[in-house]
Amino acid sequence: MVRFFGLNKEKNEEKENTDLPADNEQNAAETSSSNVSGNEERIDPNSRDTNPENANNDDASTTFGSSIQSSSIFSRGRMTYGTGASSSMATSEMRSHSSGHSRSKNSKNLQGFKDVGKPLRAVSFLNPVKEEESQDTQNTLDVSSSTSSTLATSGNARENSFTSRRSITLEYIHKSLSELEENLVDIMDDIHQDVISISKAVIEAIEYFKEFLPTTRDRIPYRISLEKSSSLRKINKIVLHFLDNLLVSDAFSNSRSILLRRFYFFLKKLNLITDDDLISESGVLPCLSVFCIGSHCNLPSMDKLGMILDELTKMDSSIISDQEGAFIAPILRGITPKSSILTIMFGLPNLQHEHYEMIKVLYSLFPDVHMYCVKDYIKKAASAVGSIPSHTAATIDTIAPTKFQFSPPYAVSENPLELPISMSLSTETSAKITGTLGGYLFPQTGSDEKFSQFASCSFAITCAHVVLSEKQDYPNVMVPSNVLQTSYKKVLTKESDRYPDGSVEKTAFLEEVQRIDQNLNWQKSNKFGQVVWGERAIVDHRLSDFAIIKVNSSFKCQNTLGNGLKSFPDPTLRFQNLHVKRKIFKMKPGMKVFKIGASTGYTSGELNSTKLVYWADGKLQSSEFVVASPTPLFASAGDSGAWILTKLEDRLGLGLVGMLHSYDGEQRQFGLFTPIGDILERLHAVTKIQWDIDPQLDG
């Protein structure tokens, strides 16, 4: 027979206590008001000796061992069955001994087995033992009644205990967070020291999250703040380090998904994720995103991080070398903005294994700042049009005649002499490079006769890398873009060749081609303007990349989005909110902005508080940037020159924040821009006159 808890040894040491089983039975009978409990009745189910004297000399270890086995946790139904005879005998023995022994003697004998009786009674309360009917029907009814009463009492006790566990305190939550942090820190130390494999480590981490506040299934009645909880920030960092650096291989995709989902429910339990943020019931797995560092972000280490990046931009570029377009972006990363922590994103066009090793070295630099590397790079937002897509099919069956409506892949103004901002733009001779018309600037000459010739002039502005060329010093500019129109014309011509001559489809394509030719000829006869100045250079550690175009006097220039542009997702961009009325010099971190580019159209985002540092043209540069929100796309090729705008809060209209010049070419979620204040300051330094977005008033 298998022995539990060393009971057999205990019997040999205290063999003189021969009356213990009977006294134990007497105590159980008295606590249930002289009714025999069904569980306590299991003390000696295998006894076949009806002599009470023999019962007193029975092996105590055998008695308790049988009781434990009769309520085995390995039984599927957690119920065992005994013979009616054994039950009757045990009941008879209990009644016999209860009348022949005193309560004091019973208490004395129970002290030796006090640590044994408690586990047995606990098992009895949780797992009732169902018996077969014995010959003594009355005894069976008494046992059943007593068992029901005992179970009801124990059930209420468990319910009250569960209710008390749910009433957790804030101190207990912080203690649990601290314990979880310590466990995860130990796991991460083992990983970095090659003590444990990543596969085993992530399994242990998932189990630790499962054990966090196990009695609380729903949200806690408190709100935990990342700013005030160092343990929570460190936990977030470790999880993000798993997801962004250690589990990036496709072999860990399943482990990554499980950990991310467990982390999501962990944050939801702490009220860092609300139902409005994500709907978990939809079955869609949450994902990590990047967010801007706004004005309300008070996370520790933020000031220190900004100082490091500022010092980095002041370093001598001659002693630094990196991949073209590589960058360092300070952002927030997490599932939602409220659950995100400070993050340094390293973008590299050619990502290699040693870069991940570098992250391991930098891991301990900040205790609560996440670092990760990704394949990405900064590139100019001008578009280089490639080859025209072709089809393999020779012909297409004709369809019924209908009136065709073509929609060109660029904005077209209703009035060719009134061109709104944000239209496509290129030089007259460009074959590939195209960008966006940012807007219009007007010189404020005042009464100075030296600049009187410019008093009534209008100037368009865009990025210098879009319109400057080594072949021509002062190129003419076309709006819409000559590059896009020519490319569109080639596509239509190629597509028309797939239809038979005289068909309605081919006729429609050729008519559209003819309209494009007419528009191109009109633009060459009515030139939009000519580049008069531009530069792409590093001035005071900042990129100066813009050019001004003197617009032909026959064109009416207004800083408005125009009614002829494509519809916007924002329904408030109508009427007065189509006009740019103010320059924004004081940029507030987290400010909601948008741009309308010739390539991607309307996209929105938020201003980041800390600049992005990147390597381009053999120099280390920095720039303000926008983080896309709520969609993960902000800019792409062809958007260079687009103005960064925001809706004014105190009046109707739009505010001008800056001009887009670059973006991250791989993920396209960052938009780098030059503030309008820097542009106007540089123009004043070069031209010696003031500039504004509104025409100069007479007098």
Swiss-Prot record:
User: What are the start and end residues of every segment in region (Disordered)?
Assistant: 1-113, 129-158
Where do Polar residues bias regions lie? 24-38, 83-93
Cite the record's Low complexity compositional bias ranges: 61-78, 144-154
Q: Which UniProt keywords apply?
A: Cell membrane, Membrane, Zymogen
The Swiss-Prot or TrEMBL record describes its family as follows: Belongs to the peptidase S64 family.
What does this protein's UniProt record list under function?
Protease component of the SPS-sensor system, which regulates the expression of several amino acid-metabolizing enzymes and amino acid- and peptide-permeases in response to extracellular amino acid levels by controlling the activity of two transcription factors, STP1 and STP2. Catalyzes the activation of these transcription factors, which are synthesized as latent cytoplasmic precursors, by proteolytic removal of an N-terminal inhibitory domain containing cytoplasmic retention motifs. SSY5 binds as an inactive protease complex to STP1.
Its protein name is SPS-sensor serine protease component SSY5
**Species assigned in the record:** Saccharomyces cerevisiae (strain AWRI1631) (Baker's yeast)
Q: In the record, what lineage is assigned to the organism producing the protein?
A: Eukaryota, Fungi, Dikarya, Ascomycota, Saccharomycotina
